[in-house]
């Protein structure tokens, strides 16, 4: 996505987008260092690396946690359910790490496309240095805490973590290094018009089916 970009489906709900203009993946799922479903991305633009690369709100969201033992993590939760890349329709939560000068504070609200941070090298004191990058982890639902990764302590990811490519579409992101994952573009499948529940539910199974299809779009 690019700065200021918004993508709203015909039902009025936002489409979740990958937060950088260029994708250059440096560590994928179940990497050798610490990850299960989180990924690392370095900044990239016009054929060269970008340090302190900007990234944007993938959907309208609120910062619900800020802090983090030198990692400078920031956790955001979507304001409403959003259309997800696997066809789902859900509230999403995500965490970003390593911004040396984070701009988001707990309680701050951002509209889809707003600047929310930059890639960086922030790490706890006494630990090995890292290269400039964005650490990104996405989860279903609201913030539900942390769960240990398969690497064990001190490595954790968001509880209810998902594949990033199942949550975020890559519309208007240039895929430089994408790891071969199943990234998807939202091509405008139109959600059905929401069904108005009648006063007398003569055919409740019909209403249920329509709601399910609406959620899946």
List where the protein language model places each region.
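Acidic, glycine-rich catalytic/binding loops that coordinate metals and/or anionic ligands
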Residues: 1-16, 45, 49-50, 56, ...
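Conserved catalytic-core segment of clan PA serine endopeptidases
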Residues: 10, 15-26, 88
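Zn2+-dependent peptidoglycan hydrolase active-site motif and core
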Residues: 50-52, 56-103, 120-135
